[in-house]
Protein backbone atom coordinates (compact mmCIF):
# COMPACT_ATOMS: atom_id res chain seq x y z
CA UNK A 1 0.00 0.00 0.00
CA UNK A 2 1.22 3.46 -0.94
CA UNK A 3 0.59 6.22 1.61
CA UNK A 4 0.78 9.93 0.81
CA UNK A 5 1.81 11.90 3.88
CA UNK A 6 -0.61 14.65 4.94
CA UNK A 7 -2.96 13.45 2.20
CA UNK A 8 -5.84 15.40 3.74
CA UNK A 9 -4.20 18.70 2.73
CA UNK A 10 -5.67 19.53 -0.67
CA UNK A 11 -4.09 22.94 -1.31
CA UNK A 12 -0.40 22.23 -1.54
CA UNK A 13 2.71 22.79 -3.58
CA UNK A 14 3.72 20.25 -6.21
CA UNK A 15 5.65 18.23 -3.64
CA UNK A 16 4.37 14.87 -2.47
CA UNK A 17 5.88 12.74 0.24
CA UNK A 18 4.92 9.09 0.32
CA UNK A 19 6.00 5.66 1.50
CA UNK A 20 5.08 2.10 0.63
CA UNK A 21 4.40 -0.48 3.32
CA UNK A 22 7.29 -2.87 3.95
CA UNK A 23 9.61 -1.35 1.32
CA UNK A 24 12.53 0.83 2.39
CA UNK A 25 12.16 4.39 1.12
CA UNK A 26 15.76 4.55 -0.08
CA UNK A 27 15.37 1.32 -2.05
CA UNK A 28 12.40 2.74 -3.96
CA UNK A 29 14.32 5.97 -4.51
CA UNK A 30 17.39 4.29 -6.01
CA UNK A 31 15.33 1.89 -8.12
CA UNK A 32 13.31 4.74 -9.64
CA UNK A 33 16.56 6.56 -10.38
CA UNK A 34 18.47 3.62 -11.79
CA UNK A 35 15.68 2.00 -13.79
CA UNK A 36 13.65 5.01 -14.91
CA UNK A 37 15.86 8.09 -14.44
CA UNK A 38 13.34 9.57 -12.01
CA UNK A 39 15.05 11.77 -9.43
CA UNK A 40 13.49 11.62 -5.97
CA UNK A 41 14.69 12.24 -2.46
CA UNK A 42 14.53 9.54 0.20
CA UNK A 43 14.77 10.00 3.95
CA UNK A 44 13.16 12.42 6.33
CA UNK A 45 14.84 15.47 4.81
CA UNK A 46 14.99 18.22 7.39
CA UNK A 47 11.58 17.37 8.83
CA UNK A 48 12.51 14.85 11.52
CA UNK A 49 10.18 16.18 14.19
CA UNK A 50 7.27 16.60 11.76
CA UNK A 51 8.09 13.12 10.45
CA UNK A 52 7.62 11.70 13.93
CA UNK A 53 4.13 13.18 13.90
CA UNK A 54 3.32 12.00 10.36
CA UNK A 55 4.59 8.46 10.95
CA UNK A 56 3.21 8.11 14.51
CA UNK A 57 6.65 7.65 16.06
CA UNK A 58 6.18 7.81 19.83
CA UNK A 59 8.83 8.74 22.40
CA UNK A 60 9.79 5.14 23.14
CA UNK A 61 10.34 4.28 19.47
CA UNK A 62 12.13 7.58 18.89
CA UNK A 63 14.54 6.80 21.74
CA UNK A 64 15.19 3.33 20.31
CA UNK A 65 15.88 4.82 16.88
CA UNK A 66 18.25 7.50 18.20
CA UNK A 67 20.09 4.96 20.38
CA UNK A 68 20.70 2.81 17.29
CA UNK A 69 21.80 5.86 15.29
CA UNK A 70 24.22 6.83 18.08
CA UNK A 71 25.77 3.36 17.78
CA UNK A 72 26.24 3.77 14.02
CA UNK A 73 23.19 1.78 12.89
CA UNK A 74 20.76 3.86 10.81
CA UNK A 75 18.58 0.90 9.81
CA UNK A 76 15.62 1.98 11.96
CA UNK A 77 15.71 5.60 10.82
CA UNK A 78 12.29 6.31 9.33
CA UNK A 79 11.74 8.16 6.12
CA UNK A 80 9.69 8.64 3.01
CA UNK A 81 10.07 9.43 -0.66
CA UNK A 82 9.64 13.00 -1.86
CA UNK A 83 8.44 13.64 -5.39
CA UNK A 84 8.56 17.19 -6.74
CA UNK A 85 6.39 18.05 -9.72
CA UNK A 86 7.37 20.86 -12.06
CA UNK A 87 4.61 23.23 -13.27
CA UNK A 88 5.43 22.42 -16.90
CA UNK A 89 5.12 18.67 -16.37
CA UNK A 90 2.50 17.08 -18.62
CA UNK A 91 -0.18 14.61 -17.61
CA UNK A 92 1.63 11.95 -19.67
CA UNK A 93 4.86 12.57 -17.76
CA UNK A 94 3.02 12.24 -14.47
CA UNK A 95 1.40 9.00 -15.67
CA UNK A 96 4.88 7.69 -16.56
CA UNK A 97 6.07 8.43 -13.02
CA UNK A 98 3.03 6.70 -11.53
CA UNK A 99 3.61 3.72 -13.82
CA UNK A 100 7.27 3.56 -12.78
CA UNK A 101 6.30 3.58 -9.10
CA UNK A 102 3.78 0.80 -9.72
CA UNK A 103 6.34 -1.28 -11.65
CA UNK A 104 8.88 -0.81 -8.88
CA UNK A 105 6.47 -1.97 -6.19
CA UNK A 106 5.32 -4.93 -8.32
CA UNK A 107 8.90 -6.05 -9.05
CA UNK A 108 10.54 -5.18 -5.75
CA UNK A 109 11.41 -8.75 -4.75
CA UNK A 110 13.31 -9.37 -7.99
CA UNK A 111 14.85 -5.92 -8.45
CA UNK A 112 16.14 -5.60 -4.88
CA UNK A 113 18.45 -8.58 -5.49
CA UNK A 114 20.73 -6.22 -7.45
CA UNK A 115 21.38 -4.05 -4.39
CA UNK A 116 23.04 -4.31 -1.01
CA UNK A 117 22.03 -2.29 2.03
CA UNK A 118 24.47 -0.42 4.27
CA UNK A 119 22.99 0.09 7.72
CA UNK A 120 25.70 2.63 8.56
CA UNK A 121 24.52 5.03 5.83
CA UNK A 122 20.92 3.78 5.43
CA UNK A 123 21.55 3.55 1.69
CA UNK A 124 21.36 0.92 -1.01
CA UNK A 125 24.14 0.37 -3.55
CA UNK A 126 24.03 -1.55 -6.80
CA UNK A 127 26.19 -4.64 -6.38
CA UNK A 128 27.62 -4.32 -9.89
CA UNK A 129 28.50 -0.64 -9.72
CA UNK A 130 32.21 -0.28 -10.59
CA UNK A 131 34.34 1.24 -7.82
CA UNK A 132 36.20 3.49 -10.27
CA UNK A 133 32.95 5.13 -11.38
CA UNK A 134 31.92 5.65 -7.77
CA UNK A 135 35.29 7.25 -6.99
CA UNK A 136 34.90 9.59 -9.96
CA UNK A 137 31.46 10.89 -9.08
CA UNK A 138 32.20 11.21 -5.36
CA UNK A 139 35.24 13.28 -6.35
CA UNK A 140 32.90 15.72 -8.13
CA UNK A 141 31.10 16.43 -4.88
CA UNK A 142 34.37 17.14 -3.07
CA UNK A 143 35.50 19.85 -5.48
CA UNK A 144 35.80 23.19 -3.72
CA UNK A 145 34.49 26.38 -5.23
Predicted regions and their residues:
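Structural preference for beta-strand elements that scaffold enzyme active sites
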Residues: 15, 39, 80-82
Amino acid sequence: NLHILAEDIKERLGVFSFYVDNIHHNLITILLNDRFGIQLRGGCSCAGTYGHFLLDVDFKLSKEITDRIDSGDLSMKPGWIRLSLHPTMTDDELLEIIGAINQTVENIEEWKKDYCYDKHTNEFHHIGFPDEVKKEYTHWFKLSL
